[in-house]
């Protein structure tokens, strides 16, 4: 009788949840303070509970700029914890000697990390919905957009972390690789514009074209600037009242990054299947990447 092929191991998943519970608990506490906690505090400070005051308090609680940074930090921490066995040879050999396939390990750790990120977000969303209903805030559709946004951002950034994990065998190189992947294109673009603007007579930085593809290849910066809530305020002199319109932009950008994340997860799965166990402890885990790394560092130093 053939044994069934599995891509998920309950024992490993349970171990991840129980061993690394401080990670998702800390993220849950952050979410509770940042969204429902801040919203409740702002509403309590209002003496005149107008529609403008409610929407403005909701806008400040749902701002995604802080969430992008928080999700990035949590994604890196999850990657360092869940794939930590790949960074020491003793643990790498021990884990891969168990009756668990690499596919099971990868998928289980991937799902574990996503659960650490998405479940706290879901709980924060539910608590905030209840708070909005109790306080008479009708714009709950923006809570749904916030929830979709943080889920999409977490899904993509954790894919980037998993991808970076496969290319290094050192624990503290992971956050460096993650930042490099997210900002190297932006750094080269900004540096090139600065150099051209500085050396080109009569040229300013604003006159040098900025290519869209380079901005897209800097995901954190692009998400930070293009997936957000906007609150447009206006003042009516006749009624002496402030009014505001809350809106959201960036859903298509988010959908594109989520689609890219699916591809990244599949590529990472293939890389894990090909990764050498003995590369644990190496700065770069694939030999064919080492020349590219040297050239990249050299060009970066010249650029600086």
Provide a role label for each language-model segment.
Residues 63-91:
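Long, hydrophobic alpha-helical segments
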Residues 174-209:
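Transmembrane helix segments
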Residues 302-304:
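Conserved small/polar residues in nucleotide/adenosyl-binding loops
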Residues 57-60, 64, 111-174, 186-189, ...:
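Secretory targeting signals
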Residues 82-118, 280:
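Helix-loop-helix units of permease transmembrane domains in multi-pass membrane transporters
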Residues 1-27:
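Aromatic- and glycine-rich beta-strand/loop motifs that create alpha-glucan
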Residues 18-46, 66-77, 180-186, 296-300:
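Hydrophobic alpha-helical transmembrane segments of multi-pass membrane transport/permease proteins
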Residues 68-72, 247-263:
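Alpha-helical transmembrane segments
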């Amino acid at each position: 009788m053939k044994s069934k092929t599995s891509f998920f191991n309950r024992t490993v998943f349970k171990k991840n949840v129980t061993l690394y519970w401080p990670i998702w608990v800390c993220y849950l506490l952050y979410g509770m303070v940042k969204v429902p906690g801040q919203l409740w505090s702002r509403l309590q400070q209002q003496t005149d509970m107008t529609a403008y005051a409610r929407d403005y308090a909701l806008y400040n609680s749902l701002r995604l700029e802080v969430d992008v940074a928080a999700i990035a930090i949590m994604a890196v921490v999850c990657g360092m914890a869940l794939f930590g066995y790949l960074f020491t040879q003793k643990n790498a050999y021990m884990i891969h000697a168990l009756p668990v396939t690499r596919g099971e390990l990868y998928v289980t750790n991937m799902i574990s990390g996503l659960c650490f990120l998405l479940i706290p977000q879901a709980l924060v969303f539910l608590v905030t919905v209840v708070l909005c209903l109790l306080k008479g805030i009708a714009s709950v559709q923006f809570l749904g957009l916030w929830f979709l946004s943080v889920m999409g951002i977490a899904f993509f950034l954790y894919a980037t972390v998993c991808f970076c994990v496969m290319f290094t065998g050192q624990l503290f190189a992971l956050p460096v690789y993650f930042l490099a992947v997210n900002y190297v294109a932006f750094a080269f673009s900004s540096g090139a514009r600065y150099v051209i603007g500085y050396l080109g007579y009569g040229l300013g930085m604003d006159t040098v074209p900025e290519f869209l593809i380079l901005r897209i290849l800097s995901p954190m910066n692009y998400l930070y600037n293009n997936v957000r809530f906007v609150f447009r305020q206006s003042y009516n002199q006749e009624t002496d009242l402030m009014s505001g319109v809350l809106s959201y932009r960036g859903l298509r950008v988010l959908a594109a990054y989520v689609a890219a994340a699916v591809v990244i997860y599949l590529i990472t799965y293939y890389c894990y299947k090909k990764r050498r166990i003995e590369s644990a402890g190496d700065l770069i885990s694939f030999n064919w990447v080492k020349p590219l790394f040297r050239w990249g560092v050299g060009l970066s130093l010249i650029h600086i």
